[in-house]
Amino acid sequence: MSFQITPTRDLKVITDELQTLSSYIFHTNIVDDLNSLLTWMSPNDAKSNHQLRPPSLRIKNIIKVLFPNNATTSPYSMINTSQANNSIVNEGNTNKELQLQLFSTLKEFYIFQVRYHFFLHFNNINYLKDIQRWENYYEFPLRYVPIFDVNVNDWALELNSLRHYLLNRNIKFKNNLRTRLDKLIMDDDFDLADNLIQWLKSANGSLSSTELIVNALYSKINKFCEDNMSRVWNKRFMIMETFNKFINQYWSQFSKLVGCPEDDHELTTTVFNCFESNFLRIRTNEIFDICVLAYPDSKVTLLELRKIMKDFKDYTNIVTTFLSDFKKYILNPSVTTVDALLRYVKTIKAFLVLDPTGRCLHSITTFVKPYFQERKHLVNVLLYAMLDLPEEELKEKINFNVDMKALLSLVDTLHDSDINQDTNITKRDKNKKSPFLWNLKVKGKRELNKDLPIRHAMLYEHILNYYIAWVPEPNDMIPGNIKSSYIKTNLFEVLLDLFESREFFISEFRNLLTDRLFTLKFYTLDEKWTRCLKLIREKIVKFTETSHSNYITNGILGLLETTAPAADADQSNLNSIDVMLWDIKCSEELCRKMHEVAGLDPIIFPKFISLLYWKYNCDTQGSNDLAFHLPIDLERELQKYSDIYSQLKPGRKLQLCKDKGKVEIQLAFKDGRKLVLDVSLEQCSVINQFDSPNDEPICLSLEQLSESLNIAPPRLTHLLDFWIQKGVLLKENGTYSVIEHSEMDFDQAQKTAPMEIENSNYELHNDSEIERKYELTLQRSLPFIEGMLTNLGAMKLHKIHSFLKITVPKDWGYNRITLQQLEGYLNTLADEGRLKYIANGSYEIVKNGHKNS
C-alpha cells in the first residue's frame, strides 16, 4: 500500500469559500466567529491557536452552530452527522449539498494547515518524539470539531501519509528511529518498542518493521553472548546453555514483536545459528588468551569451537588473529626465551585440539620459526626442559638469568603428556577390529581379520567404498603447495621444526650428552636421557626412512626432495652417541676388573673415551690450561690406573683429560663444619694447596699459588673466587687463607659470600648517594641488557635505552637514568670485556666460549 499527498487549493480561496458558504447556509453573519474557530484550529498560529487547551465559550458556540448535538466526542467528537445536517436547515437537496461542501471545505482547510505546518518543520523532525508531539498537536482540535466523523479513515489516511513521507524522505529521522528501537530492546523496554513498531507499521514506509526487529534481535543476541560467553572457557555446552537462557528470558517478547508463534522451529533454528556465529566471533577474538594463557583449562571451549568451525575461512581468521597477538605479546625482545617457548608449547597443544589435522599449526609454525631462530639459546632451553635438568647445569650453558619458575612450568607442560604422542590421535582400542577385511601394514605385511565374515564382503568392495567416500582435503587450509603428509601433529616434531635443521638439534643434544657423560658419577645414566635419546632416534630413523622411500601423491610416483646429506649427518651424530654410550659401558666393565687388582685405590672410577667420537681433542685445548699440577697423591693413583690399562690393553696408552675430571672432596674445619663438594681437578688442586699436615694456618699469595700450580693469575683468580663464594677461603691483605672458624652458620656464609663479592662491584669513586643509587640501578639492569643482546644481537644505545625503560621494573627507578649515564655504563662493561663496542655505534655480547644456539 502506498500513499500520495495530493496538492490542495490556495488557502485564501479555501477561506473565502468557507465564509461564503457559512453566510449563505445560516443566513446570519458568523464570519467573525468562524474566523476565530479557524484560527483556534490552525497549528500555524502558535499565539492564537488552541495551544492544547480547550476552546473558549465563543468558539464552543460556533462549534455548536456548525455541529449541533456534539455532546460526546469519540474518538474525534463523534456525532450523528445526518441529524446535524438536518437540524441546521431542511430546505431540500440544494442546502444539503451546500452543507456537505462546507464540511468538505473545512476538512480541506485543516489538511492544508496541517500539511503546511508539517513541511515547515520537516527538517526539525529528527526523533520519534518530535513527530508524536506534532501528531498530538494536530489531533487535539479534532476532539472538539468533528470534521472527519463522516469517514474516520480520512484523517488516519492523511496522518499515515505524512508518516510515510517523513520515513522515506528524512534520512536522519529514519536512522534515529532505528537507533531508538535498538536502545529500547537493549534496555528491555519492550512496551515502548512495541509502540514504535506499531507506528512503523502504520507508516508503511521504506523502513521495514520486521527488518528493524531482526536487526535489533541480532544486536541483542550479540550483547547477550558478550555478557555470558566472554572469558568463560571452562564450561561445556556454552552455546546451548546461553541459547536456552536467552529463550527463557526474552523469546516471548520477541515473538510478540515479530508476530510469530513462540514454537516456530525454523526461526529458533536461525536464532541458534546466530549464537553459534557469536561464539565463533568471541572465541576468535579471545583465541590468544585461550591457547596461551588459559590452556589446558580452556580445552573444553576449544572442543566446542572445533565442532562449529565448518569453513576454512573460520580457521584462517583464527590463525590470523592469533598470530597478530602472538607476535605482539610473545615474539618481542622483552619476553625471555623460556617464556616464549612455554607459550609456544601451549599453543601447539591447544591448536592440535582445535584442528587435529595440523594445518593451522603448520601456518603458525611457519610464521614464528624465523623469530624463534633469532633466539640463540632456544635449543639449550628446550633440551634442558625435555631432560628436566637442574638449574646449575642450565646456567653453565646460558649466560643470562633464567626464570626458574617459568622453566619448571615449561617442564611440566612438556611432560604432562608424552611428548612423543600425536596429540590429535585418539588412542585406539586394541580389541577393536578394522572395518576392512585386511589390516594392511606399512612394510607390506597383512593380517587377516578373522572376525569379519568373508562371504559377505569382498576385498575390492571395501576398497571401492573407501575411495568413493573419500573427500579431498581443502588446499586453502595451508599456504603454498605443502602436502598433508608434511604436516606435523606430534609435539616433538613440531618443536623440532623451529630449528634450521634436525642435525643442529641432534648435534646440540650430543654436546649436552657429552658434557653429562664427562661429569657423570659412576657409569649409570639417568633414565630421562635414555628416553630423550630414544625419542630422537625414533624420529630421526623415521624421517630418514621417509626421505629415502618412494611415495605416491595424486597418483604419481615420486621422490621427496633431497634430504640425504642432512639424514647422513643425523645418523653420524647418532652413531657417535652410540659409541660414547658403548665407551661408558666398557669403562664400567674395565673399572670393575681394575678394582680387583691389588694396590689400586677403588674410589677412582675412570672413563676411557674414544677421542674421535667424543668431540674432544687435547691438542685443541690451551697448553697452559692443561699444564697445572695435580696433587701428588692423586697424580700417583691416576698413573697406576694408566699402567694397569696398558697391561690390560697392550699397545694402548692413556692420556688424562685434566679439564674433564671431577673429584668429590670433603672439607673439615676446626669449628666442626664439614663441606662435601664435587669440583673439577683444577679446583681440587687449588684447595689442596691449603692442606696443612700439622694443622698450622697457611696464607698464600696469588703469585705463590700461580708458581706452585703452574696456573696463570687470571685463571687462578677465577678459581680462588669459587672457594671464596663457598665460604672456604678468605682474601685479606693480598693473601688467601682458610676460614677455620666461622662467625655464622656455614649455610648463611654461602649465601652472604657471593653477595659481598657482588656488592664490592658497586663501590664507586664518587661518594654521592644519588650517583650510587644510579649505579646500583644500572648494575641491577645488567641481566636485562645481556638478555636483549643475547636474543637480538647487536643493538644501538638509544634502542637499548628504550627497551630498558619498558622491561626494567618501575620501582627500580630506571626512568631517572639518562642516555649519557647508560652509555658510560656500557662503555665500562666494554672495557671489562663483558660487552663489545662495534664501529657503527652498537653493542654486542661477548661470547664466553660456549656454543650458542
Curated annotation (Swiss-Prot):
One record GO biological process: regulation of mitotic cell cycle
KW Ribonucleoprotein (keyword) present: no
Pathway: Protein modification; protein ubiquitination
Subcellular location: Cytoplasm; Nucleus
UniProt keyword list: Cell cycle, Cell division, Cytoplasm, Mitosis, Nucleus, Ubl conjugation pathway
Cellular component aspect of the GO annotation: anaphase-promoting complex; cytoplasm
Domain of life the protein comes from: Eukaryota
GO molecular function: ubiquitin protein ligase binding
Quaternary structure and interacting proteins, as annotated: The APC/C is composed of at least 13 subunits that stay tightly associated throughout the cell cycle: APC1, APC2, APC4, APC5, APC9, APC11, CDC16, CDC23, CDC26, CDC27, DOC1, MND2 and SWM1. APC2 interacts directly with APC11 thereby anchoring APC11 to the core complex.
UniProt record similarity statement: Belongs to the cullin family.
Function: Component of the anaphase promoting complex/cyclosome (APC/C), a cell cycle-regulated E3 ubiquitin-protein ligase complex that controls progression through mitosis and the G1 phase of the cell cycle. The APC/C is thought to confer substrate specificity and, in the presence of ubiquitin-conjugating E2 enzymes, it catalyzes the formation of protein-ubiquitin conjugates that are subsequently degraded by the 26S proteasome.
Note: Present with 432 molecules/cell in log phase SD medium.
Protein name (Swiss-Prot/TrEMBL): Anaphase-promoting complex subunit 2
Biological source species: Saccharomyces cerevisiae (strain ATCC 204508 / S288c) (Baker's yeast)
